[in-house]
Amino acid sequence: MRIAVDAMGGDHAPKAIIDGVQKSLTAFSDIEITLVGDESKIKPYITNNERITILDAKEVIEPTDEPVRAVRRKKDSSMVKMAQEVSEGRADACISAGNTGALMTAGLFIVGRIDGIDRPALAPTLPTLDGSGFLLLDVGANVDAKPEHLVQYAMMGSIYAERVFPKSNPRVGLLNVGTEDKKGNDLTKKTFELLKASDLNFVGNVESRDLLEGVADVVVTDGFTGNIALKTIEGTALSVFKMLKETLTSSFTAKIAAGMMKPKLMQMKSKMDYSEYGGAALFGLKAPVIKAHGSSDENAIFHAIRQARDIVEKDVSAIIHQEVQKETTNES
C-alpha cells in the first residue's frame, strides 16, 4: 500500500509532515510513502529513507490562493502532483494539511467522483465523552444540499463507521434544532422522511448540544451547518482548556492542586483531542483523500496516515461504489 503525502501543506510543513510520516513507517510495516514537495527542503528532515519516495514539486498552493484557479494553474504544486499520484494509480490514498478548498477541488477533478454520488462530503471524526467518537458530515464540501444528498452522506458515513470504527449497525442522526420528528426547516423535514424510510439505522433528529454525549455514530447535515457545528466544538474545547489552565495556575494552592490532578487532566485532554482520530475524509471520491488540520503536528499526521491506511485496507471507497450501484439498479 502506498500513500501520497503533501509535504508542503500546513503551518508546520515540511518538518511536522515528515516526522509524522517517519513515525507511521515505524508503526506500519505494510505501507510506503510518496512525499510530494520541494526535494531540497524535504531531504534534510529524513532520517531513514526506507520505504520513502520523494516526488519533487517546486510550487506550493498557499492558504490564500483561490482554490479552483490554484489547482488549474499550479500544475507543479505539491498538492496537484499528490492527487495525480492517486488518479494515475501510483498511490492508493493521499493526505494534505494544505488549503482545504484546493484539496477538495483536486480531489473532485483529479482523483474523481464515484459515479452515482451527487456531492462529495467532508467528514471529520470528533471525540465523544466515552472515547468512541462520531462522524460529522458534511462540514463544508457543499454549503447547500438537497435531502437526497444528506441520505447519501448517511450511507457513506455508515459504511465508514461500520468498517473503520468499527461499529456494528451504526446509529445515524440528523442534526436539527430539536429532537421531535417535525422539527426543522424544509431540508431537514424531507431528509427525516427519507432517512426513516431507508435501511439505515436512523435514530432521528439530534441536537448539537448532545453530540459529544455520543447520541449517534454518524451525524449528517448540510456543509454550512456542519462547518458551524465543527468550529463551535473546536472553539469551545479550546476555551475550556484555556480557562482550566488559567484557573489552575492562578495561585500557589491552585498549582499544587493542578500537580495532583495532572494525570487526570492529561487523560481528559487526550480523550478530547480530535487529532487522535485522524483528519477529515472526503467521501464520495474514487480513492481516499484526507484533509489533515492546517496546524497538524507530527502526531496528527501520523493519525491521518493511520486513517488513510484503514480506509484503503477496509475497501471503504469500493464498498461505497458498490452500494451506489446497487441503489441505482433498484431505482431503475
From Swiss-Prot:
Superkingdom of origin organism: Bacteria
One of this protein's Pfam families, by short name? FA_synthesis
Gene Ontology CC: one annotated term: cytoplasm
- Is Protein biosynthesis set as a keyword in this record? no
- Cystine links in this protein are none
Where is this protein localized, as stated in its record? Cytoplasm
Involved pathway(s):
Lipid metabolism; phospholipid metabolism
Reaction catalysed by this enzyme? a fatty acyl-[ACP] + phosphate = an acyl phosphate + holo-[ACP]
Q: Which InterPro entries match?
A: FA_synthesis, Phospholipid_synth_PlsX-like
Q: Does the keyword S-adenosyl-L-methionine apply?
A: no
Q: Name one GO biological process term.
A: fatty acid biosynthetic process
Provide a Gene Ontology MF annotation, just one. Answer: phosphate:acyl-[acyl carrier protein] acyltransferase activity
Q: Which UniProt keywords apply?
A: Cytoplasm, Lipid biosynthesis, Lipid metabolism, Phospholipid biosynthesis, Phospholipid metabolism, Transferase
Enzyme Commission numbers on file: 2.3.1.274
Enzyme class label: transferase
Q: What HAMAP family has UniProt attached to this entry?
A: PlsX
User: How does this polypeptide assemble, per the annotation?
Assistant: Homodimer. Probably interacts with PlsY.
The family line of this record is: Belongs to the PlsX family.
Query: Could you tell me what this protein does?
Result: Catalyzes the reversible formation of acyl-phosphate (acyl-PO(4)) from acyl-[acyl-carrier-protein] (acyl-ACP). This enzyme utilizes acyl-ACP as fatty acyl donor, but not acyl-CoA.
- Protein name according to UniProt: Phosphate acyltransferase
> What organism is the protein native to?
Bacillus pumilus (strain SAFR-032)
